A protein has these predicted regions:
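Glycine-rich P-loop/Walker A and Walker A-like loops and their local beta1-loop-alpha1 context
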Residues: 1-56
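Residue-level preference for the first positions of well-ordered beta-strands
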Residues: 29-33, 128, 158-160
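Short acidic, S/G/P-rich loop/turn micro-motifs used as interaction or catalytic elements
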Residues: 38-43, 72-74, 105-110, 135-139, ...
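A short acidic (Asp/Glu
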Residues: 42-48, 75-80, 139-144, 170-174
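Long, charge-dense
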Residues: 64-111
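Mid-core helix/loop region of P-loop NTP-binding domains shared across ATPases and GTPases
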Residues: 111-123
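Conserved P-loop NTPase "ATPase switch" module shared by AAA+ and STAND
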Residues: 124-140
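Glycine-rich, aromatic-bearing surface loops/beta-hairpins
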Residues: 142-191
């Protein structure tokens, strides 16, 4: 099945009332990963925007809420006036240290990270959450961490992570090259 067909299948699945129930298969939390080849990023972004615009017209009985994780990180850094400090820190200490500093300041590894808190605070009751920007966040934010932390604290509506790479319901491989830690709780959407 090509990407366009998978996107169509994903859109149909999300509109089914059974998709939006509180739990997924086998009583698991309703978390999904839509994986795709990284070269198709723009096509995926266009479809998400199309679905969000269509949903905003009020045709559905639920709301799409799209969170670009990269934008959340950048907004946080700007609000704290950390952007210039990050540039300087990276020049002096390198990318590994800036990744650690930003991760620590946002509590990325905590169950109640600033990203989890932001998503919880900005998601209405009857919604489907789309997580985007995973590739743009690397290496500051790792996909398995986002899913694990969100899974612990946020179960009131389905979550779909759009993942530029491969997910086989056991491991996440970002950009089809970088193996993330294993993650078993989400289901692959539109195989």
């Amino acid at each position: 099945m090509d990407l366009s067909q998978r996107l169509d299948e994903m859109e149909l699945a999300i509109h089914k009332p059974s998709f939006r129930k509180g739990t997924g298969r086998a009583n698991e939390v309703n978390y999904w990963v839509f994986d795709y080849t990284p070269e198709k990023e723009l096509e995926v972004r266009e479809r998400i925007e199309y679905m969000k615009n269509k949903n905003d017209r009020g045709d559905d009985d639920f709301e799409f809420v799209v969170f670009d994780l990269y934008d959340i990180i950048i907004d946080f850094l700007k609000k704290k006036s950390f952007m210039e400090k990050c540039y300087d820190f990276e020049k002096k200490r390198g990318i590994e240290r800036i990744v650690k500093a930003v991760s620590n300041s946002m509590k990325v590894n905590d169950d109640d990270s600033l990203i989890v808190r932001y998503i919880k605070e900005h998601t209405p009751e009857n919604a489907v959450v789309f997580l985007t920007g995973i590739g743009k966040c690397y290496p500051i934010l790792r996909s398995h961490k986002v899913l694990n932390n969100l899974h612990q604290a946020f179960v009131r509506c389905p979550v779909v992570m759009f993942f530029p790479g491969t997910y086989n319901e056991q491991e996440l491989i970002l950009f089809n090259e970088i193996k993330d830690d294993n993650y078993y709780r989400a289901f692959r959407l539109a195989k």
